[in-house]
Curated annotation (Swiss-Prot):
It comes from the Bacteria. InterPro entries: UCP032146 (IPR008321). It comes from Erythrobacter litoralis (strain HTCC2594). Belongs to the UPF0262 family. This is UPF0262 protein ELI_10965.
Amino acid sequence: MAQHRISHISLDENTILWRNADIEQERRVAIYDLIEENTFKPVRSNAAGHTGPYRLHLSVQDGRLAMDIRDRDDEELEMLILGLARFRRPIREYFAICDSYYQAIRKATPSEIETIDMARRGVHNHAAELLIERLEGKVETDFPTARRLFTLICVLHIKG
């Protein structure tokens, strides 16, 4: 039976220059949720007979997202490189809204928090759709998986 899913995910710790408790929590939740439920089918690897589950290592190399896809035994299957130029604005917007959200949960009213959270979800959803579009023909994935992957892409872009 095919198991077109990610069973393990890691981030290049050398890429992450700075983090705080809020960002660390976002990273943990995204990884946990991603491992629990995801759809991830690398097109070339699948055509070569690999059905998963997959191990995925994310890093940023020369300003591009590197997706190192491996089989369950950690043997390299393929390396996908995605340009991140189209993600710069959503990443910047996501960070700005997250900063507002983290400040709001400490002192704002529930309706103010809800408004900020709706904006955060909107940016997140748009970025997930963009990621699905960028992965087209390379990796088949679903919307929840793309949302969680975008969260992890953002973690890789934290500069402090």
